[in-house]
């Protein structure tokens, strides 16, 4: 499973002009299920995402996670948006191939699972809409953008 994390001051996602998800300071997480992924990859990606220390402490060092933005236990927002294009293979020619992305039904099942698990352990979760044409608006903080990948077995 692939995640592209962006530390944001704020972010929102719109579908057909309607805001369907919005957060203040926190993480925008673009996520993609790959062929062979299961709940195990989703669990590992979420655990890493929530514990990753990419928010600054008082000294300006990246020592805080989205679960503790201020050192007092204040959680940041988590905006989760599905994006199958993260699995693009651009090695051949000029048109990307997306054959490594999970089939739509599997991708949606794992996305829904990922969101449910996030909501079970994090108080501020917003989402996009799976397979929708979305417009994502964000104010990057830093900018800090990190790719994460939990490889499928085999």
UniProtKB/Swiss-Prot annotation:
Homodimer. An aminoacyl-tRNA editing enzyme that deacylates mischarged D-aminoacyl-tRNAs. Also deacylates mischarged glycyl-tRNA(Ala), protecting cells against glycine mischarging by AlaRS. Acts via tRNA-based rather than protein-based catalysis; rejects L-amino acids rather than detecting D-amino acids in the active site. By recycling D-aminoacyl-tRNA to D-amino acids and free tRNA molecules, this enzyme counteracts the toxicity associated with the formation of D-aminoacyl-tRNA entities in vivo and helps enforce protein L-homochirality. HAMAP family: Deacylase_Dtd. A Gly-cisPro motif from one monomer fits into the active site of the other monomer to allow specific chiral rejection of L-amino acids. The keyword Cytoplasm applies. It is found in: Cytoplasm. Belongs to the DTD family. GO terms for molecular function: D-tyrosyl-tRNA(Tyr) deacylase activity; Gly-tRNA(Ala) deacylase activity; Ser(Gly)-tRNA(Ala) hydrolase activity; tRNA binding. It catalyses: glycyl-tRNA(Ala) + H2O = tRNA(Ala) + glycine + H(+); a D-aminoacyl-tRNA + H2O = a tRNA + a D-alpha-amino acid + H(+). Its EC number is 3.1.1.96. This is D-aminoacyl-tRNA deacylase. The gene is dtd. It is an enzyme of class 3 (hydrolase). The keyword ATP-binding does not apply. It comes from Acidovorax sp. (strain JS42). Keywords: Cytoplasm, Hydrolase, RNA-binding, tRNA-binding. Signal peptide: none annotated. GO terms for cellular component: cytoplasm. A motif (Gly-cisPro motif, important for rejection of L-amino acids) lies at residues 142-143. GO terms for biological process: D-amino acid catabolic process. InterPro entries: Daa-tRNA_deacyls_DTD, DTD-like_sf.
């Amino acid at each position: 499973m692939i995640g592209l994390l962006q530390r944001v001051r704020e972010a929102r996602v719109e579908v057909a002009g309607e805001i369907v998800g919005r957060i203040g300071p926190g993480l925008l997480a673009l996520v993609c299920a790959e062929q062979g992924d299961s709940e195990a990859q989703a669990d590992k990606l979420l655990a890493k995402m929530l514990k990753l220390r990419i928010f600054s402490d008082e000294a300006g060092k990246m020592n805080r996670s989205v679960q503790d933005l201020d050192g007092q236990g204040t959680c940041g927002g988590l905006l989760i948006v599905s994006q199958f294009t993260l699995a693009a293979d651009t090695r051949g020619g000029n048109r990307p191939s997306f054959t490594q992305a999970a089939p739509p039904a599997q991708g949606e099942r794992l996305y829904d699972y990922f969101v449910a698990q996030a909501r079970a352990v994090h108080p501020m979760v917003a989402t996009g809409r799976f397979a929708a044409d979305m417009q994502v608006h964000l104010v990057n903080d830093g900018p800090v953008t990190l790719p994460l990948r939990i490889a499928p077995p085999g």
